[in-house]
Amino acid sequence: MTSSTSQITGSIVALVTPMLDDGSVDYPALRKLIDWHIAEGTDCIGVVGTTGESPTVNVQEHCEIIRVAVEQAAGRVPIMAGCGANCTAEAIELTQFAKKVGADCQLQVVPYYNKPTQEGQYRHFKAIAEAVDLPMVLYNVPGRAVADMAHDTVLRLAQVPGIVGIKEATGQIDRAQWLIREAPKGFAIYSGDDPTAVALMLCGGHGNVSVTANIAPRLMHELCVAAMAGDTKRAMEIQFKLLPLHKNLFIEANPIPVKWAVARLKLCGGTLRLPMTPLTPANEAALESALHASGLL
């Protein structure tokens, strides 16, 4: 379903959630990160998703992160609020809060662990869209959710009022191409996979929900601008520069490496909550090398 929010394009950072040494959310650091991203050209800020450690923040923290992000952005860039849950009622409650505080859109992941059927997925997302009038971006990430959203299910959901796009995080470009070919006009197709995002955008995709943008926001913005304009030469110049980061930011489970990287660049603290554990020394060395190779150190 088309919506003005489907016009969100470009670099959408999947923002980390800064935490203090005791594991509490560092809200002042979150505000500073948002200001920095806006200054660096990030086009949209996504909060409390996978990279934002949504599985390990409680409901009160989840809501407060959304509220603070909206308040700090102050309309300068859109806020994409992670509101996903594997309980439909909980997802509706989170989405109601996001709408109340002024988020621009919601990101809704395929329900994880309980493995709904395609019909279950359809009814889940449709129920949320009908309950809360806040533009929804679907999020397909079978590597984490286990359940996979089939192509035909996406097309069914694209007809539901309020569902405006999808974050396609399988890394399978052929799947994205079919969606770009067959989805209704105005339905946005975003990459959720940094290594293949440039290819998706060159095929007609609308942007990249990016982990790499946490530490290289200006370069990711420039890559998205070039790719969406069809400037393959410039897009690939930037892509080749960022490749070491795309690889090594996933050397362990996200967000472990990117939390280390933001701390290394002194953007915010790198504390993680269990069951996430710190990056191993061997992988620290690999990511340090990638930061140098990409010109960030």
UniProtKB/Swiss-Prot annotation:
One of its GO terms (biological process) is lysine biosynthetic process via diaminopimelate. GO terms for cellular component: cytosol. SUPFAM superfamilies: Aldolase. One of its GO terms (molecular function) is 4-hydroxy-tetrahydrodipicolinate synthase activity. CDD domains: DHDPS. The record marks 50, 113 as: Part of a proton relay during catalysis. Disulfide bonds: none annotated. It comes from the Bacteria. It catalyses: L-aspartate 4-semialdehyde + pyruvate = (2S,4S)-4-hydroxy-2,3,4,5-tetrahydrodipicolinate + H2O + H(+). Its EC number is 4.3.3.7. It is found in: Cytoplasm. The keyword Amino-acid biosynthesis applies. Belongs to the DapA family. Catalyzes the condensation of (S)-aspartate-beta-semialdehyde [(S)-ASA] and pyruvate to 4-hydroxy-tetrahydrodipicolinate (HTPA). NCBIfam families: dapA. This is 4-hydroxy-tetrahydrodipicolinate synthase. It comes from Albidiferax ferrireducens (strain ATCC BAA-621 / DSM 15236 / T118). The gene is dapA.
